[in-house]
């Protein structure tokens, strides 16, 4: 993970390098193994390198080619051999940095280059011949990239603090982005968490022209599945296993020890198992970290969810003699105790403060063990372990009634109630108000449709028809149907937010830990979005292809568990411990926070007595979602306005 920055003074002023030097100093926490810059008077590029792969020792950015192209890149390329073969560089590959391959690729394929890349990347390329600047990010946005533009110049940086190092770009929160964050809405459009600073969106190329035009182009097509040449069911099963192992192998490029998150779920288990098998062949060990609840804590008994994932994770760990299983309860940590550090390092408000506690503690423990790479399976729900239930409404809309009936009966035989089968099959096809009425009739309850039931927004904003229309345009309206196919659901999950890159930068700056997610590998995404729905739900078996691909690796107790794990199940006790911190933060809420948030209601929630009994649905929405996210955003606003009162 590296930090890049640059300035183009379109008015011709020759002092760009001076400001780039300021930006590089501000970005030093994200890359201080090597710092360098390229200066051409009105245009300057800077880089602060963090060496995280073996090939990073060959990195000599900024790079230049033919006195035309000048490149700075924050990247880890995961298809190095494939690129080198296509570029005729395979004999030199061992001594080429990833940036060398990227520049050679751009010389060959120009703006078609991003579609040939696999990995995490954000880069800037100055085309001196055509006087254009290109900014590009990978499809999931695992490396952030921000910019600011005015009539005279264009400025970009990996993190907003690089832009805020310049005196004419003041630090201030972006109210509109924060409103969507409070509403749990998906991120769309270029706005960032900071005023007057835009982001290059995931899967996008932003081209800046000499006349000041800023042209965003989506280089990745989310709408059209790729033809991967797979024909039989077995072809897909074998491709799933092989592609996933290739993705994991790419994430193991490191000279340092490696750790992984290991929950009791399917995604992190698949990642950990694949990594352990491959590391064993090298004679290396793997630390697998599992969050477990505080001893004696009041837990949230939510449906059939697994509250302590430690025992399930231990079953997987026990299969591998080279896994060191570490259970983390973060007993010495408290909700909100590192919000200041989070703000300065990651520069966004954490969405889930109760999970932030153990995630941060795992990074601390990895730092103590000198482990620099952390494997995660965050995107697995949308890729390797898609449940496939959305096949049912797809069958209904295409008129495949015999197949729909057969799958419904098979699900019922596996323990699904008739009501659940019917709701899954036709729920996405019904108007939400009618679906809610049916759920209340047969289940006794339905999920809340009132935005204020789960979002800590100021009620005045919720009543604004323009804002409601905005949410519906995002596909987050309160009365919109659910996705009608597995692919539609997967795309909505993969594109929902854009904070993974910020999370990774924050962990790198604070702990020197580089987060890598093979479940979000471009090849894995292309494959899973092309999988026929009958390989996801088949004969009543959800996640059919996952079971076929990984049955010999994942314990049956884990694969066949009825419910999902509930991370942070000890949140009721955690919140009780942190009520003083949360109340203090809300008491410090400034006018901007009071405009966006329902501050009086949040203060009441911070002081509420939730008792000692079973957690109710209302308490879960109020305490875990509204209170914690509201306090996090109030803190972010205060820090972004440089206020400590």
Across the structure, where does each feature detected by a protein language model lie?
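Cysteine-centered catalytic environments shared across enzyme families
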Residues: 1-331, 336-341, 345
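Adenosyl-5′-phosphate
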Residues: 1-8, 14, 21-22, 40-41, ...
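Glycine-rich active-site loop/lid subdomains used to bind and stabilize high-energy intermediates
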Residues: 8, 34, 47, 305, ...
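Short hydrophobic beta-strand that contains or immediately precedes a catalytic carboxylate
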Residues: 72, 375, 520
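Generic, well-ordered alpha-helical scaffold segments in large soluble proteins
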Residues: 86, 243-251, 274-278, 316-319, ...
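An alpha-helix initiation/capping motif
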Residues: 100, 238, 269, 356, ...
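Conserved acidic
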Residues: 232-236, 240, 350, 354, ...
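Phosphate/ATP-binding catalytic cores across multiple sugar-kinase/actin-like superfamilies
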Residues: 238-260, 365-369, 373, 495-502, ...
């Amino acid at each position: 993970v590296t930090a890049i920055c640059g300035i183009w003074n379109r008015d011709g002023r020759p002092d760009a390098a001076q400001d780039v030097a300021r930006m590089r100093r501000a970005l030093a926490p994200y890359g201080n193994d090597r710092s360098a810059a390229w200066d051409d008077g009105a245009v300057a590029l800077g880089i602060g390198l963090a060496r995280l792969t073996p090939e990073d020792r060959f990195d000599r950015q900024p790079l230049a080619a033919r006195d035309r192209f000048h490149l700075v890149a924050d990247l880890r390329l995961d298809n190095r051999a494939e690129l080198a073969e296509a570029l005729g560089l395979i004999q030199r590959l061992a001594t080429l940095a990833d940036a060398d391959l990227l520049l050679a690729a751009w010389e060959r394929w120009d703006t078609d280059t991003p579609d040939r890349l696999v990995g995490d990347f954000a880069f800037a390329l100055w085309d001196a011949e055509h006087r254009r600047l290109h900014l590009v990010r990978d499809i999931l946005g695992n490396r952030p990239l921000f910019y600011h533009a005015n009539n005279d110049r264009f400025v970009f940086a990996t993190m907003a603090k690089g832009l805020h190092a310049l005196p004419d770009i003041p630090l201030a929160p972006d109210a509109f982005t924060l409103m969507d964050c409070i509403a749990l809405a998906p991120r769309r459009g270029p706005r960032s968490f900071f005023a007057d600073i835009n982001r290059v969106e995931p899967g996008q190329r932003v081209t800046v022209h000499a006349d000041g035009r800023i042209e965003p182009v989506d280089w990745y097509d989310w709408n059209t599945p790729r033809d991967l040449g797979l024909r039989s069911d077995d072809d897909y099963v074998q491709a799933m296993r092989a592609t996933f192992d290739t993705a994991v192998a790419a994430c193991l490029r490191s000279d340092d020890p490696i750790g992984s998150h290991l929950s009791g779920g399917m995604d992190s288990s698949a990642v950990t198992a694949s990594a352990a098998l491959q590391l064993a062949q090298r004679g290396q060990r793997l630390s697998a970290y599992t969050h477990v609840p505080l001893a004696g804590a009041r837990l949230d008994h939510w449906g059939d969810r697994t509250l302590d994932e430690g025992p399930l994770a231990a079953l997987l760990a026990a299969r591998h003699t080279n896994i060191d299983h570490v259970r983390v309860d973060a007993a010495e940590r408290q909700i909100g105790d590192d919000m200041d550090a989070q703000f300065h390092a990651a520069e966004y408000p954490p969405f889930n403060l109760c999970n932030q506690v153990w995630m941060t503690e795992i990074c601390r423990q990895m730092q103590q063990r000198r482990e620099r790479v952390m494997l995660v399976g965050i995107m697995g729900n949308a890729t390797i372990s898609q449940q496939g239930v959305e096949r049912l409404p797809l069958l209904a809309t295409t008129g495949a009634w015999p197949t729909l009936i057969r799958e419904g009966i098979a699900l019922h035989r596996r323990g699904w109630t008739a009501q659940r089968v019917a709701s899954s099959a036709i729920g996405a096809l019904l108007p939400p108000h009618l679906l809610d009425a049916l759920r209340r009739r047969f289940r006794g309850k339905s999920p809340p449709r009132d935005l204020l039931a789960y979002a800590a927004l100021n009620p005045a904003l919720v009543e604004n028809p323009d804002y409601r229309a905005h949410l519906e345009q995002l596909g987050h309206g309160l009365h919109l149907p659910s996705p009608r196919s597995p692919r539609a659901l997967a795309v909505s999950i993969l594109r929902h937010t854009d904070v993974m890159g910020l999370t990774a930068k924050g962990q790198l700056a604070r702990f020197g830990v580089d987060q890598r997610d093979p479940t979000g590998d471009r090849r894995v995404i292309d494959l899973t979005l092309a999988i026929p729905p009958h390989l996801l739900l088949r004969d009543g078996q959800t996640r059919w292809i996952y079971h076929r691909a990984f049955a010999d690796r994942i314990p049956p107790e884990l694969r066949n568990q009825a419910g999902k794990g509930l991370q942070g199940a000890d949140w009721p006790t955690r919140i009780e411990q942190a009520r003083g911190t949360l109340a203090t933060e809300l008491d410090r809420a400034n006018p901007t926070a009071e405009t966006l948030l329902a501050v009086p209601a949040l203060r009441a929630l911070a002081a509420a007595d939730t008792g000692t009994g079973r957690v109710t649905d209302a308490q879960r929405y109020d305490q875990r979602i509204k209170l914690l996210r509201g306090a996090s955003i109030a803190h972010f606003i205060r820090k972004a306005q440089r206020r400590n009162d």
